[in-house]
């Protein structure tokens, strides 16, 4: 009779541990589910960090992207970009020689996504702006950008 109680206790304990593991795994899965149809997007732009003190960029605060910060060769903050990709400003094309590089919040991957392939607003990356084939703003991406390639090429 004691063996039967011990087996029941062990079985109960295994079930509780299994449920705990299942719940913890489910909490870490991205709950965003996107449909599989392809979007009809023309291109995407993702503001990225560019330049360095040794390799400066040619830009000015007006044409710099909102959300990106611009710095001098010495690392001194110059400005935040003023141009909104959804509604671009008419800016002069001159280079601000005080600006050497930018730091943007999303800095993985390419700045220009063309062609977009089967990207939709749902599968597009947060912080990236997607435009139709006519060049008009469609949406901002909704999915988190992968941090690293989990399956490197063999």
Swiss-Prot record:
The record marks 93-94 as: Reactive bond for chymotrypsin. It holds the Pfam family Prot_inhib_II. Keywords: Disulfide bond, Protease inhibitor, Repeat, Serine protease inhibitor, Signal. Sequence repeats lie at residues 31-87, 88-147. The record marks 36-37 as: Reactive bond for trypsin. The keyword S-adenosyl-L-methionine does not apply. Residues 1-31 form the signal peptide. Disulfide bonds join 34-122, 38-118, 46-128, 58-95, 61-79, 62-91, 68-104, 121-139. GO terms for molecular function: serine-type endopeptidase inhibitor activity. InterPro entries: Prot_inh_I20, Protease_inhibitor_I20. Belongs to the protease inhibitor I20 (potato type II proteinase inhibitor) family. This is Proteinase inhibitor type-2 CM7. It comes from Solanum tuberosum (Potato). The gene is PIN2-CM7.
């Amino acid at each position: 009779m004691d063996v039967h109680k011990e087996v029941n206790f062990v079985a109960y304990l295994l079930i509780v541990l299994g449920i705990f593991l299942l719940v913890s795994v489910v909490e870490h899965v991205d709950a965003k589910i996107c449909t599989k149809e392809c979007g009809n997007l023309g291109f995407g732009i993702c503001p990225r960090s560019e330049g360095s003190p040794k390799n400066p960029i040619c830009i000015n605060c007006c044409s710099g992207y909102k959300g990106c910060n611009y710095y001098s060769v010495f690392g001194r903050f110059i400005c935040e970009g003023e141009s909104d990709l959804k509604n671009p400003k008419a800016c002069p094309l001159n280079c601000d020689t005080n600006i050497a590089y930018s730091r943007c919040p999303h800095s993985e991957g390419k700045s220009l996504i063309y062609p977009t392939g089967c990207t939709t607003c749902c599968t597009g990356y947060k912080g990236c702006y997607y435009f139709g084939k006519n060049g008009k703003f469609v949406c901002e991406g909704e999915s988190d950008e992968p941090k690293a390639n989990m399956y490197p090429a063999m």
